């Protein structure tokens, strides 16, 4: 059995935060799942919802989002270099399919053997395997017939 910290160690720290991820690493979790999406200025940020307060994430600059305590994937790798030794599950949120290209660019010179991509968004899943062959992918769904729809 492998233990994955959902949104980092989110029972003690804010979901998808540097501290939540750091604490999950400290506690010895095998992996960490975080939610990622593109913000209005193109950074890959860690946040679950498509909006915060009255701001849509996809239309809001990273500078504004940082005021809410939102971090970027770049910051995770900069501040937590040990993340490369953990399984990292990136749950891709939102509807902006440009996130796939941003992830490809981000991981161009980083190890991806322990990175897994998942999403509820069929459009993202359809292009992810063709657009980005490194790492692995899986679909997150609540509906059993979704798999048949995505593979057709």
Per-region residue spans from a language model:
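Phosphate-group recognition and catalysis centered on beta-loop-alpha active-site segments
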Residues: 1-152
């Amino acid at each position: 059995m492998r233990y994955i910290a959902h949104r980092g160690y989110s029972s003690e720290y804010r979901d998808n935060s540097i501290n939540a991820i750091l604490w999950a690493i400290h506690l010895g979790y095998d992996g960490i799942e975080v939610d990622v999406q593109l913000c209005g200025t193109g950074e890959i940020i860690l946040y679950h919802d498509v909006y915060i307060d009255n701001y849509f994430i996809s239309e809001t600059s990273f500078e504004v989002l940082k005021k809410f305590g939102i971090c970027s994937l770049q910051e995770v790798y900069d501040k937590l270099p040990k993340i490369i030794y953990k399984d990292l599950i990136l749950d891709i949120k939102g509807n902006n399919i440009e996130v796939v290209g941003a992830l490809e660019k981000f991981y161009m010179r980083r190890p991806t053997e322990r990175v897994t991509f998942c999403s509820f968004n069929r459009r993202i899943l359809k292009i992810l395997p063709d657009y980005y062959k490194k790492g692995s992918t899986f679909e997150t769904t609540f509906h059993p017939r979704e798999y048949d729809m995505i593979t057709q």
